Amino acid sequence: MASMGEKEAVAELYDKVTSNGILEELFGEHLHDGYYEVGTVATISAHRVAVVRIIDEALRFADVFTDDQAKKPRNILDVGCGKGGTCVHMARKYDIQCTGISISPDEIQCAKHLAASQGLENKVSFDVGDALNMRYSDGSFELIFVIQCIEHIQDKEKFIREIVRVAAPGAQIVIISTACRNLSPSEKSLKPKEEKTLKKICNYLHLSGFCSLSDYSNWLTPLPIEDMKIADWTQNAAPFYTLLLREAFSIKGFISLLMNGGWTAVKVILGMKTIHEAIENDLLKIVAVTFRKTK
């Protein structure tokens, strides 16, 4: 993030989302997209399953947990850990030490409470911190997991360098993000209308901007990584946006948003609505990117 003011704005947004219980019924303890079979009609109960499934699908895509126990990572860093749901799920399901980091103090408090409520205090730990300047030593973690965090980071290239820095030699890195389309060979920039749409989303959700898949390739090329893979999960995530807008713009849903979250909640929904429109227009995609740090 470019300035302390921007960092504080992001922290404040998630503090309000967390403390006011905005969208709690939909998201539960997971503040990220879900993974559905293509063509599924999402429901609230199905989304509670989908937001967990996307974690397992990402780990499967990255070939992290195989039958070979010798290759099992000893620890995980979840960057932009939110309310701790991802850390708690991975620690419980895969019996692994997990550390989460978030810039939001309220999110970290929620995360610690969640871990304690499930008896996982010895498996999971959480830190308030800046993802661009993490306090961890070089090579500290054998798996790095990032889900819909990079959109908040101003200096995305530095962020990529930072997560590679804290990754151990041979560690797998998994990133799920909302990415903008690649430029065509004849383009020097996105169309003005597209730029306007992305700026609107960023203003609503305190995002710093979106990178493209080409950006990932350019940033990773000089780094000590190998075996990069990319998957387009846009259609797998799409049912969530339909569900969110259906619930939020119902009379009951909209009144609940205003009562519980005020203008902050309304901005979140308007931002998600604009993301949905950008996806429909092929401006944005939901992507999974994975690669391994060289040994």
UniProtKB/Swiss-Prot annotation:
It is found in: Vacuole membrane. It holds the Pfam family Methyltransf_31. SUPFAM superfamilies: S-adenosyl-L-methionine-dependent methyltransferases (SSF53335). Its main location: membrane. Mainly expressed in young leaves, and, to a lower extent, in mature leaves, flowers, stems and roots (at protein level). Transcripts levels are highest in flowers, moderate in leaves and low in roots and stems. Pathway: Alkaloid biosynthesis; vindoline biosynthesis. The keyword Methyltransferase applies. GO terms for cellular component: plant-type vacuole membrane. It catalyses: perivine + S-adenosyl-L-methionine = vobasine + S-adenosyl-L-homocysteine + 2 H(+). InterPro entries: Erg6_SMT_methyltransf, Methyltranfer_dom, MTs_g-TMT, SAM-dependent_MTases_sf. Optimum pH is 7.5. GO terms for molecular function: methyltransferase activity. Residues 76-85 are annotated as: SAM motif I. Keywords: Alkaloid metabolism, Membrane, Methyltransferase, S-adenosyl-L-methionine, Transferase, Vacuole. GO terms for biological process: alkaloid metabolic process; methylation. Residues 139-147 are annotated as: SAM motif II. A motif (Vacuolar targeting signal) lies at residues 138-144. Optimum temperature is 30 degrees Celsius. Residues 166-175 are annotated as: SAM motif III. Its EC number is 2.1.1.-. Signal peptide: none annotated. Homodimer. Belongs to the class I-like SAM-binding methyltransferase superfamily. gTMT family. S-adenosyl-L-methionine-dependent N-methyltransferase involved in the biosynthesis of biologically active monoterpenoid indole alkaloids (MIAs) natural products including vindoline. Catalyzes the conversion of perivine to Nbeta-methylperivine (vobasine) by methylating its N4 nitrogen. Inactive with picrinine as substrate. This is Perivine-Nbeta-methyltransferase. The lineage of its organism: Eukaryota, Viridiplantae, Streptophyta, Embryophyta, Tracheophyta. The gene is PeNMT.
